[in-house]
Structure formats: structure tokens, C-alpha cells
Amino acid sequence: GSEMCIRDSYVPSLYEVTYKEDGTIASFEPIYEDVPKTIQKQIVLNMTEAVYPEKPVVPFIKATQDRVVLEIQRGCIRGCRFCQAGMVYRPVREKNVEHLKDLAYKMLKSTGHEEISLSSLSSSDYSELEELVNFLIDEFKGKGVNISLPSLRIDAFSLDVMSKVQDIKKSSLTFAPEAGSQRLRDVINKGLTEEVILNGSRLAFEGGWNKVKLYFMLGLPTETEEDMKAIPQLANEIAALYYDTVPKEKRNGKCQITISTSFFVPKPFTPFQWAAMYTPGDYLARARVVNEGVHAQLNHKSIKYNWHEADVTVLEGILARGDRKIGQALLKVYEKGGIFDAWSEYFDYQRWEDAFAECGIDTDFYTMRERDLDEIFPWDFIDIGVSKEFLKREWKNAHDEKVTPNCRMKCSGCGAMKFGGGVCFENKD
């Protein structure tokens, strides 16, 4: 009997991989003539008409995600060079605002949840955000429904919205500059300047906020000690701004600035897929630079610093860019009792190290080397719409510290236009 395959689903056994002596891929070929050489990403172009759960299941027990989640758009126009979602979900497709109002009403009515969260990769870029948020406030605020807006840029509009939907005394502002210095922010194409951060903070402090969370990554390509030291310096400037902006009698205690750093892991389908990683010791040394920098600041009493475990980062790096050889090690870890390893209390790095050793896998091969531009990657047979040529250009732009504009400012020819919809065709009527 013959079996049918759904178009563009990947069946590993139908492809054969050969390797060079150095362990990199020599070829990746289908074993039958009628098997496609590349797998094309399938995409829903009309997000408004796509099925969305109007009656999400509500569990008997209290769940962590105890709220209605409303997706307002898919994709992101920003093009941060470290971000996989921003590349994989191109092009941006918005949902119609009237449809979203209707969905919000139906979902809140059917679940009885007391919170609605607007979900997207960058909510501030949703073109009808103001109308949607004002509708939700007018319609549901009086009924005891909280409105949560993750991934907002901090500006006058979002602060105005947040002051309407949050308890200012309890809530904090979140910025994700990702890198401490402007130079490194240009390398990663994160279009957030110090001016924007300080201006947003000042407006927030004037509005009564006094808690700020800052998120950064350590170990980004081209990072220097100067870039690391810029992280506590930025936090100190924000703290100084609070004490300059808010007169003593109006202060709600001292300001609290929390810096959190994670260690950067290069991901497939991003401009940084060629980047090298570091050893756990090197990562922790970077965190130490930041920690010492925090203690050296004038306002160090207002600054708190959290950092990640480094061995989890290295493991994530192996899994993120691993090939099919890693599969056997995964099975071994499971056989050794590794099941809830994403929970720190169950995580045992030794178990992973043993599994890799037993399979004869040199993990440094996946983490410690910068890839050649012409290397064939284990995921190259998947066509996500964004071309490898575009990613190469962006990898070069990163090293040249050149910023690429977002999709609404200017098309950079990433390849996603071939899907025939979304942001690529927004203003082409």
C-alpha cells in the first residue's frame, strides 16, 4: 500500500545526510525522486479569518496562565538579529480590530477570566492598538477585568494606557535594551536608544512609577568589557534620573531597578546562526563584570542584579543548533531519568554530559566555533521564506555595526514577500 504525505511536512527518514571529516554536513539529499528537496513553510495569510478559540477550556484548578490570551497579530517588523521568532514568523499579519473586539467579548464571556492579555511579538507595532485598548478599557475595566499588555515600547501613549489599566504603585516598567552600549545595540539591530529609554523612564517617574526592570543578554557577538560595563552604567543613569525628577516629598520610597541578564544562544534562521558561543566559566566571568559594575555605581543601593546559570545556556546552545546526531543523546538522557529538565530542581547537567560522552559527541563542535559562511546547516533544507542570503547580509551588517530599518520604514528584501501578503503589501493598493 502507498502512504500519503502532507505537503511540506518533513519526514527525516526520506533524507540522507553525509558528513565531511570535520563533522560538518557534506550533503543533505532526498532518497527518492518525488521527495521535495526543500520543505516550504506554510503560512496563514488572512489572520482575521483564521480559526481562533472563542471558548478556551477553563481548568478546575488555578493555572499559571489564568487569563484570556488574545493574539492581535503574528510576526514582527523589527528584525532583531538574535531573534528567531522575528525571522520565522515573517511577514507581519495583523488581525482586524473589529474582529478582535468581538473575540475579546466572546472569550471573556465564555471563560469568566478576570484578565485579558494582548499577545504579539511587539504590540506597539499593531496599527490599531489605541482603538483596541480604549475599547477594552471602556468595555471591561468597570467589570473588574484587568488588561495586560506585554511587549509594549515605553512612550507617552503606552504610559497613558498603563496608568489606566495598572496599579502604578505595584507595577513596574520593563525595558529590554538587550545590550548596554549603543554600539552593541546597533550590532544586534535593536532599535532602542539610550535617549528613548531615559525619556520613557522620566515620563514614568513623573507619572508615579518607581520600579524599572531591565533585560540584557551577555555573550552577544563582538561584545567587549566596555559593553558589559555599560549595563550597570545605564541602570545608574535611570536611578539618578528618578532622584532628579521626583521631588523628595512625592517619592514612593526609593526607586528599584532590577537588571536581569541571560546568556545569548545563537538560533537557526537568524543572522547570528553563524556565531560562536563561550564556555560556562567565560559566561559567569561576564556576569561577574556586570555584578562588580553594579556595586561600583553611585546608586547601587537602588539596583538589584539577577543572572542565569551558565551550564543550562551551553546545553541550550547544543540543542538549538544540533543535528540529527544529537537525537541519540536525547534518548539516553531520557533513559537516565531526565524528564522535567526545564525545571531547575530536576535539572542534572552531569546526566547530559554522560549521555553526550556515551554517544561520542563532542559538544564543543556545536557551541564553540564560528561557522563558515558556506557551511551547510542541518536546517538549511527548510525554507522559511527568509533567504539565507539575507541572513548573511545581516550577519555582515552586524559586524559593520549597520542598522537595518524595520519593515514599515523600508523593505530590506528578506524574501518573505513571496508569500504575497502581510506587511509586505500593506501600502501597495
Residue ranges, per PLM feature:
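Canonical Radical SAM [4Fe-4S] cluster-binding loop centered on the CxxxCxxC motif
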Residues: 62-98, 413-428
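N-terminal pre-triad scaffold of radical SAM enzymes
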Residues: 56-84, 108, 149-150, 171-172, ...
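Conserved SAM/AdoMet-binding glycine-rich loop
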Residues: 105-258, 262, 266
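Short, small-residue-biased leader/transition segments that mark boundaries at the very start
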Residues: 1-6
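N-terminal [4Fe-4S]-dependent radical SAM core
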Residues: 12, 18-69, 385-397, 426-429
